[in-house]
Swiss-Prot record:
Protein name from the UniProt record: Shikimate dehydrogenase (NADP(+))
Family the entry assigns: Belongs to the shikimate dehydrogenase family.
Annotated gene: aroE
Name of one Pfam family that matches: Shikimate_dh_N
Keyword Transferase: no
Length: 286
């Protein structure tokens, strides 16, 4: 890596963040594209966010990636939000346009870009998402923005169930796309929705231990279903193994991780990240 007086910086900001794979991905991308940049990981306290944002301008940085717990808090420092970031209510990428800071959310678009190798396009398709956390909302919002026909969200009944239902109703009203919430434990209803589904996504952390399972194993998957697990630290979760045994195409979360990074990289540099080469390196790293 060449570092000189012309080198520009980007960084990921979160707490904690020292475990992040983002520096590996982006610094490799800078090298492979001959872009004179460097990417760092900054673990900062909330009270330092304002100073960090100002340094993006002062140091003419490309921008920032934002991870937990600051994806919502960073919004107040933005000059403008992309449609996806505004709809999701979270920013994971800050882009510096000559001192004007624009907040984007690349999680959803990165996810769907990672499915292009399956010739999958979300337009006019039905999607079933397991979970209602931040990752799920990003996928749901992007699916709606990209013209999905119907989105079904399955979550367990808990204190967050009714607030999630309200949030999904607002997303539906803003996008005009039908978005329904159903109980994850309701096997009959899930089977009915699965029969009409083109894409099934596990957006929960269930399965990260390599043993737990997010839904009823008695459910039957329709033909030609694409099944994705957002988890990438376990190469094939029990969920993906179950889907593969039923003949489904399967994809783990590594594509989503690299996909959102590729979208950020493009917004900063105008260059396409060499995703295939980086995926090969990441498969050795993870």
């Amino acid at each position: 890596m060449k570092i000189d007086g012309y080198t520009r910086m980007a960084a990921v900001v979160a707490n904690p963040i020292k475990h992040s794979l983002s520096p590996f991905i982006h610094n490799l991308a800078f090298d492979l594209t001959d872009e004179n940049g460097v990417y760092l990981a900054w673990e900062v306290e909330s009270k330092k966010l304002a100073a960090i944002v100002e340094n993006v301008r002062n140091l003419d940085m490309y921008g920032l990636n934002i991870s937990m717990p600051y994806k919502g808090e960073i919004i107040k420092f933005m000059d403008e939000l992309s449609p996806a970031a505004e709809l999701i209510g979270a920013v994971n990428t800050v882009v510096n346009h000559s001192g004007k800071l624009i907040g984007h959310n690349t999680d959803g678009i990165g996810f769907f870009n990672s499915l292009k190798k399956y010739d999958f396009k979300i337009e006019n398709k039905q999607i079933l998402v397991l979970g209602g956390g931040g990752a799920a909302i990003a996928l749901i919002a992007q699916a709606a923005l990209s013209g999905a026909k119907k989105i079904v969200v399955a979550a367990r009944k808990s204190a967050s169930y009714d607030p999630l239902n309200e949030k999904l109703a607002k997303l539906s009203a803003k996008t005009g796309v039908e978005i329904l919430l159903t109980d994850l434990s309701g096997a009959d209803r899930l089977q009915k929705e699965l029969n009409q589904t083109d894409l099934l996504v596990n957006a929960t952390s269930v399965g990260m231990d390599g043993a737990s399972f997010p839904l009823e194993k008695s459910l039957l998957l329709p033909d030609k279903l694409l099944v994705v697990d957002a988890i990438y630290k376990v190469r094939e979760t029990p969920f993906l193994h179950w889907a593969k045994e039923q003949g489904a195409q399967t994809e783990n979360g590594l594509g989503m991780l690299i996909g959102q990074a590729a979208e950020s990289f493009y917004l900063w540099t105008g260059k396409e990240m060499p995703v295939d080469k980086i995926t090969l390196e990441m498969e050795r790293e993870v």
